[in-house]
Every structure is written in C-alpha cells, then in structure tokens.
A protein has these predicted regions:
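Conserved FAD-binding catalytic core of PHBH/FMO-like flavoproteins
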Residues: 1-85, 98
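Conserved mid-domain beta->alpha element of the FAD-binding
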Residues: 33, 65, 86-169, 173-175
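Amphipathic alpha-helical interaction/coupling elements
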Residues: 69, 148-151, 182, 186
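Short, hydrophobic secondary-structure boundary micro-motifs
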Residues: 78-81, 163-164, 199-200
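C-terminal domain-closing interface element
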Residues: 174-193
Length: 207
C-alpha cells in the first residue's frame, strides 16, 4: 500500500530559484520551498507517494527514489534537486478525527490528540491553540480537572477535525492526476492570491 514520504533539507538563498515561497505540484508529488529565519535559510520539502516504509522522524533519505519519483518534472524542479546532497526523511501519518481525547485526570494535545498531514502546515499551530484553550478551561474549572478537560475537548474537536480532513483534501489537490489535475489548474488560474488566503481566513485568523 503506497504511503506518503516527506524529504526535507535546508538551503541558502543563493541556491534557490527565487526568494519566495513556491510550491510545484505534480502527479502524486509536490516540492515546496519557504523561508526560515527571516529569509537567511530556506526549507525545501519534497513529498511523494512511496512503497517504502522507514521507522522514525529523521532518517537519511534515498536520493535514488527521490530522483525516480520526480523524473519528468519541470526543469526548475530538476535544477533544484540536482544541487542537493543529503536529505532527511519521514513518513506522513494521520488518523480519523475523534470526539474525545481526555480520560479522568489525563488529556492530550497536539499530534497526540489529532495527528494531521502537513498540507495546511497546522500541526504545531493546533498544538499551540490547544494549550491556550486548555489553560483557559482549567482557569475556569474551580479545580475540577475532569470538567476542564471535557470543556477543552468540546471546544477543540471540531476545529482540529476540520484541519485534519482539509489537510487530506489539500494533499489530494496538490497530487492530482489526469482530469482532476486539469480542473485544479483551471481553478487556480482564475484565483488571485488574496482569494486563496480569504478561503482560509477561518483558519489563519486563529481562535
């Protein structure tokens, strides 16, 4: 059963195509670059469907598989990949949204409660929001952890579940093939950057 692999490395601005956040989408793969540390470094991330599974979060990647998965992509992507030596890799995982992640005097937050794919870049953001919501509920609970945790679950499960499911959808959108790919390109061609951001205002406006 194919899984999704993520390869990542950091590059200097002199090694990239353009000093900007750019995503190249292709059939069952995509490549994205985005700035780190105020633009002093760039993260380059390649995601593709793979038949391999490697346990862990920071394994040495297989450049042969990467080259094979991105064969036939545009010259810009090929030029970027040709500059690269050692990649790090991990397998992407999520699960179905759940309604509760608290029990008694114990609760979860972040990926432990609602693991999600990276396509919305919201895993860490949701964990931070969880922490804020949990602190608020505990402050209002009059010392009852069970009540605080129940209210915390109630306050968070829909928003985090929406992120989990939408991240999957974005993955399918990025990696589309055939007619789906053509329809995706037509839709994006007719949208401005502002329209794309507006569609996710519910997410990026925070809680």
């Amino acid at each position: 059963m194919p899984i999704e692999q993520c390869y990542r490395l950091r590059m200097f601005p002199s090694d990239i195509v353009k000093n900007a956040m750019i995503l190249w989408a292709g059939p069952k793969n995509h490549l994205v670059q985005y700035p780190l540390r105020g633009g002093k470094l760039f993260n380059l991330v390649a995601v593709f469907h793979s038949d391999k599974y490697v346990e862990g979060w920071n394994s040495t990647a297989d450049p042969v598989e990467l080259e094979a998965r991105f064969a036939g992509t545009c010259e810009t992507v090929q030029a970027l990949l040709s500059k690269i030596g050692t990649w790090r890799m991990w397998v992407l995982c999520d699960r179905e949204p759940v309604r509760h992640w608290s029990r008694g005097r114990s609760t979860l937050l972040g990926d432990a409660a609602h693991p999600m794919l990276q396509y919305l870049a919201q895993g860490a953001c949701m964990a931070i929001e969880d922490g804020v919501a949990l602190a608020d509920k505990m402050a209002d609970s009059n010392g009852s952890l069970a009540d605080a945790f129940k209210e915390y679950d109630d306050a968070r499960y829909k928003r985090t579940g929406k992120c989990q499911l939408l991240a999957r959808l974005y993955g399918e959108f990025y990696h589309a093939e055939g007619v789906r790919r053509e329809l995706r390109n037509d839709m994006l061609r007719g949208r401005s950057t502002e329209q794309s951001y507006d569609g996710l205002a519910w997410l990026y406006d925070g809680i």
